[in-house]
């Protein structure tokens, strides 16, 4: 399944390269809402909130009312998750909140699942140089993606793996890594990071892995009708 991505920063849709350099910027929200309306799921990320530089909550609420969204970025508490679901999000994405003092926070994961239901939770694994990155990808931990999946999979409905090293480059995601992750969990697995062609989507589909695509859609390299 192809999941279009909407990344928000400063009240606009943006696309970043490897989470740092801004490559594209749009404010034609209505056009993208219409274009994405046929998809069963859209990913909505508040980059400002993820980086601790404000938020785009009002805009997120507008999108979530009109599109079936899983929403993430800066959700640090159970209350944050509950409030985002109340705005209309189908699911919420938790990432940095799952790491505490350099280790996976199983207690927080369990508390969140008890509060909103594991099926409403997507646990984000943002990987850079083989290690999980947190706080808007600015802080690198010693935890691997496989370790995070093993520790936390009983408390979520899906995992979202982002390969930061290839994010925004449109050069493909390493499929060997994806295969390892697929073998490690029975949960829904969603991946992101440089996916650029319909052929890649087909390969991932064959592995029962869903794909988040941003840059390739916004540049026109990947046509949504395919």
What do the predicted segments below correspond to?
Residues 58-60, 65-92, 176-211:
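Catalytic cores of alpha/beta
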Residues 19-36:
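Short catalytic helix/loop segments, enriched in acidic residues and glycine
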Residues 31-45, 153-155, 159:
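Catalytic domains of carbohydrate-active enzymes, especially glycoside hydrolases
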Residues 2-8, 42-44, 69-73, 92-94, ...:
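Hydrophobic faces of well-ordered beta-strands that scaffold small-molecule active sites
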Residues 59-60, 64, 140-190:
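Active-site/ligand-binding-proximal alpha/beta "capping" segment
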Residues 40-55, 96-102, 161-171:
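Glycine-rich, proline-tolerant flexible connector loops at the mouths of alpha/beta enzymes
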Residues 8-22, 89-167:
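Conserved anion-binding
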Residues 83-108, 163-165, 193-226:
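Glycine-rich phosphate-binding active-site loops on the catalytic face of alpha/beta enzymes
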């Amino acid at each position: 399944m192809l999941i279009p991505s909407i990344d928000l920063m400063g009240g606009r849709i943006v696309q970043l390269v490897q989470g740092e350099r801004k490559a594209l910027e749009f404010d034609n929200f209505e056009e993208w809402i219409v274009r994405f309306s046929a998809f069963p799921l859209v990913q909505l990320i508040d980059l400002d909130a993820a980086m601790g530089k404000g938020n785009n909550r009002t805009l997120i609420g507008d999108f979530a009312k009109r599109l079936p969204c899983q929403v993430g970025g800066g959700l640090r508490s159970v209350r944050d998750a509950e409030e985002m679901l109340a705005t209309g999000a189908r699911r919420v994405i938790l990432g940095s909140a799952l790491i505490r003092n350099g280790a996976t926070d199983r207690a927080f994961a369990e508390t969140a699942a008890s509060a909103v239901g594991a099926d409403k939770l997507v646990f984000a694994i943002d990987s850079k140089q083989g290690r999980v990155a947190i706080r808007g990808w600015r802080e690198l931990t010693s935890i691997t993606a496989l370790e995070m999946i093993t520790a936390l999979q009983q408390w979520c409905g899906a995992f979202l793996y982002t390969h930061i090293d290839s994010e925004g480059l449109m050069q493909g995601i390493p499929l060997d890594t994806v295969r390892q992750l697929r073998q490690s969990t029975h949960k829904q697995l969603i991946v992101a990071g440089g996916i650029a062609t319909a052929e890649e989507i087909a390969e991932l589909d064959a592995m029962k892995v869903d794909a988040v695509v941003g840059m390739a859609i916004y540049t026109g390299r990947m046509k949504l009708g395919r």
